[in-house]
């Protein structure tokens, strides 16, 4: 990898101070609610263990509502985005009531959906419930998407929802695509397809090697293809026809400032928190290792947010092994928390992949 430019280094130094401020002040900006583990798909890479939905039934909304009321007592609710996740949130019959209640508490709210139940009627009901943002997963053309999602008809529903939402004013809307070895070669054609649907914002992810995804070679890009993905995003951004960006994870060296709207930082525990299906208080919903900081059924959320989360806000414990003598640790801070196992070991380094 070639070195970073002077412009990039200056930007990273300025950004480093912003990260320090966030570690100290930890302003809550985004709260995920894992509302259900039920799902209507069988995704190859799924991070939520939807097979245990019978063990962990849907969280009663009133339990989560109490958390929101407590947060509203302390912070400005207008500045905190509530993201309803799953599973598939639309599996909840009361989702629209939940959304409206969140809206009535003056929190903006959004959701992440696989699109399977995103009919025009349900979209209208979501909008009437005060929906502020929506993300739909679309992992390539029909054959590739359905393969990834473990369904025979998922593509049509998701693509239809994208076409509807792309025309909806006033909603923050984007599509996320998990790039893998099946859809990699068709990214250029898929980009043109998304543009034809009217999409303005497209996030591309790679699947991190945890759980079943770690053992599936179709899901893990080679280092060469990973760099190719960075070049594709960089080129697409320069074209200016669709706002493409790489997912939030990973310090990307020479690609910092080139493939995302912002420079890398893991906001887990700094500005992002989550309430999981069992009441656990955590940070980013992608974190599957045990870095929970409390539980809403026995702890006060505000007390947990303001006085715990030390492993997230002081990353010095990560400066070991591969990160021990890395000159980029001052900017990377040990990569995302979701890329640490239960013992604190690093699972994946994006910078190493780009060397």
What are these regions (language model features)?
Residues 50, 86, 138, 206, ...:
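Residues that line or immediately flank small-molecule/substrate-binding pockets and catalytic motifs
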Residues 27, 37, 266-267, 320:
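Residue-level preference for beta-strand/loop junctions
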Residues 25, 74-76, 128, 170, ...:
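Alpha-helix termination/capping residues and helix-transition junctions
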Residues 35-42, 270, 323-325, 329-330:
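Cysteine-centered iron-sulfur cluster-binding motifs in ferredoxin-type domains/subunits
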Residues 54-55, 128-129, 133, 137-139, ...:
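Radical SAM enzyme [4Fe-4S]-AdoMet core and its adjacent flexible, acidic
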Residues 2-133, 221:
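Conserved alpha-helical substructure of the radical SAM core
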């Amino acid at each position: 990898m070639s070195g970073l430019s002077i412009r990039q280094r200056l930007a990273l130094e300025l950004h480093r101070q912003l990260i320090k401020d966030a570690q100290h002040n930890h302003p809550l900006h985004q709260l995920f609610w894992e509302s259900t583990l039920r799902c209507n798909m069988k995704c190859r890479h799924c991070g939520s263990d939807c097979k245990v939905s019978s063990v962990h039934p849907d969280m009663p909304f009133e339990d989560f509502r109490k958390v929101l009321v407590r947060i509203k007592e302390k912070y400005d609710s207008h500045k905190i985005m509530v993201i309803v996740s799953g599973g598939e949130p639309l599996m909840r019959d009361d989702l629209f009531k939940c959304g409206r209640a969140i809206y009535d508490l003056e929190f903006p709210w959004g959701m992440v959906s696989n699109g399977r139940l995103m009919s025009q009627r349900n979209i209208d009901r979501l909008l009437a419930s005060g929906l502020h943002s929506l993300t739909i997963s679309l992992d390539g053309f029909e054959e590739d998407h359905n393969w990834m999602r473990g369904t025979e008809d998922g593509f049509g529903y998701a693509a239809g929802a994208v076409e509807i939402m792309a025309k909806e004013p006033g909603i923050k809307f984007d599509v996320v695509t998990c790039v893998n070895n099946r859809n990699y070669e068709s990214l250029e054609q898929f980009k043109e397809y998304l543009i034809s649907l009217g999409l303005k914002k497209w996030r591309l992810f790679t699947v991190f090697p945890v759980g079943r995804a770690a053992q599936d070679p179709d899901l893990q890009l080679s280092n060469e293809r990973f760099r190719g993905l960075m070049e594709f995003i960089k080129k697409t951004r320069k074209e200016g026809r669709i706002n493409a960006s790489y997912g939030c994870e990973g310090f990307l060296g020479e690609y910092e400032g080139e493939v995302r709207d912002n420079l890398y930082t893991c906001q887990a525990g700094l500005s992002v928190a989550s309430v999981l299906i069992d009441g656990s208080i955590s940070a980013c919903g992608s974190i599957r290792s045990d870095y929970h900081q409390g539980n809403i059924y026995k702890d006060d959320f505000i007390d947990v947010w303001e006085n715990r989360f030390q492993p997230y806000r002081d990353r010095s414990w990560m400066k070991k092994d591969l990160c021990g003598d890395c000159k980029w640790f001052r900017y990377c801070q040990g990569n995302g928390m979701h890329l640490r196992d239960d013992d604190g070991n690093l699972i994946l380094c994006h910078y190493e992949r780009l060397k």
